């Protein structure tokens, strides 16, 4: 198999988070444009079935009976021909070789499975027992199913995936447009010191919505393989800066810890991530995830940013200097009021950098106000 035709080997699972990562790696390994996917499509078109284990170790070898050892380079045509045999196929862990063919796989029969067909039940049990992905090609149902540590994914053709991906991309464009609007409003309110918890929650809500739809599209990109290159470029352009902005908003507004309530930036981000779709639509729930009480009175209460988000927009300003400026001045309003001399009192800020920060903040303030009122 040519190196440029072969995706990265998926490896083995390791826990729930590992299973999710293995599923993505496995989808990439069988995506359109790879030799493995080409071979699977040939098997499907040839009206034959197949059971392919994507990896090998002592556990896999111990459950193999019959068949024969090959240890030959993987090619799509070889896979097609070997699937004509009545038995499973075992590939090397890097998917570069066909190790065994025509084998009968005997996984632990007590492993629970909801599959009905013999081939699919075996594939599900093998993937659960050995941790390697297993592909089952159904002759009667004419489908390719991927089993990864208890998860099952039916591989679709590119046209069906692209149709859903384009719908999701159109949704992302609308979400991003709305995010830009509320983020611009927040910037103007920050300059005027008129921000409420409601304003912050609205921006955090939109950032999370954009991030989630982008994650969904990223899954489509993985499934599409070479057919998803244009989609990947569009996605990268739309979500540029969204993840850093999400963290900056939380750093700016996560409440100061108190005796009754405290939440770190990482904890707030994790709480936002755990919100269900219905919960994300409620600003009060978003506010609680950020660390506020979420009551109607709290939503309308005033808050002031620390200044991380606006300082990050100043060109060529290192993160370490931003942290020192925020720590020294304690809030955005004091930063906006600081003179060049005041800024120079911060460690690492010389006259040139102080002037750059002063001019950068002034330009941001002017543009934010103009965008809101003009």
From Swiss-Prot:
Domain annotation DAC: ranges: 20-158
Pfam families in the record: DAC, DisA-linker, HHH
Binding residues annotated for ATP, in chain numbering: 87, 105, 118-122
Cysteine-cysteine disulfides: none
One biological process term in Gene Ontology: DNA repair
Regulation: Diadenylate cyclase activity is inhibited by the interaction with RadA.
Catalytic reactions on record: 2 ATP = 3',3'-c-di-AMP + 2 diphosphate
PANTHER family: DIADENYLATE CYCLASE, DNA INTEGRITY SCANNING PROTEIN DISA
Role summary: Participates in a DNA-damage check-point that is active prior to asymmetric division when DNA is damaged. DisA forms globular foci that rapidly scan along the chromosomes during sporulation, searching for lesions. When a lesion is present, DisA pauses at the lesion site. This triggers a cellular response that culminates in a temporary block in sporulation initiation.
Record protein name field: DNA integrity scanning protein DisA
Organism of origin: Streptomyces coelicolor (strain ATCC BAA-471 / A3(2) / M145)
């Amino acid at each position: 198999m040519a190196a440029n035709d072969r995706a990265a080997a998926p490896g083995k699972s390791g826990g729930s988070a590992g299973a999710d990562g293995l599923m993505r790696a496995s989808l990439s390994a069988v995506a359109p444009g790879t030799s493995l996917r080409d071979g699977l499509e040939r098997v499907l078109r040839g009206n034959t079935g197949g059971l392919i284990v994507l990896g090998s170790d002592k556990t896999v070898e111990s459950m193999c009976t019959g068949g024969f050892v090959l240890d030959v380079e993987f090619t799509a045509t070889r896979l097609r021909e070997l699937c004509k045999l009545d038995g499973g196929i075992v590939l090397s862990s890097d998917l570069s070789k066909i190790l065994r063919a025509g084998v009968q796989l005997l996984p632990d029969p007590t492993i629970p499975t909801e599959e009905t067909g013999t081939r699919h039940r075996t594939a599900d049990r093998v993937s659960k027992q050995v941790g390697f992905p297993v592909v089952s090609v159904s002759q009667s149902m004419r489908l390719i199913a991927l089993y990864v540590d208890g998860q099952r994914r039916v591989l679709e053709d590119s046209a069906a995936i692209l149709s859903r991906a384009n719908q999701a991309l159109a949704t992302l464009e609308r979400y991003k447009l709305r995010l830009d609007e509320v983020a611009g409003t927040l910037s103007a309110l920050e300059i005027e010191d008129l921000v409420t918890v409601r304003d912050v929650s609205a921006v955090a809500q939109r950032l999370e919505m954009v991030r989630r739809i982008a994650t969904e599209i990223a899954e489509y990109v993985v499934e599409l393989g070479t057919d998803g290159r244009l989609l990947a470029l569009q996605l990268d352009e739309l979500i540029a800066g969204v993840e850093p902005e999400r963290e900056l908003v939380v750093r700016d507004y996560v409440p100061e810890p108190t005796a009754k309530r405290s939440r770190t930036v990482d904890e707030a981000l994790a709480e936002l991530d755990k919100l269900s779709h219905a919960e994300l639509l409620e600003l009060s729930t978003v506010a609680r995830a950020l660390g506020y009480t979420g009551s109607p009175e709290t939503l309308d209460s005033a808050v002031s940013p620390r200044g991380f988000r606006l300082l990050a927009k100043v060109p060529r300003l290192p993160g370490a200097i931003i942290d020192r400026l925020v720590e020294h001045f304690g809030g955005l309003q004091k930063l906006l009021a600081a003179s060049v001399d005041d800024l120079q009192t911060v460690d690492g800020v010389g006259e040139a950098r102080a002037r750059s920060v002063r001019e950068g903040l002034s330009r941001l303030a002017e543009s934010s106000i103009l965008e809101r009122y003009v």
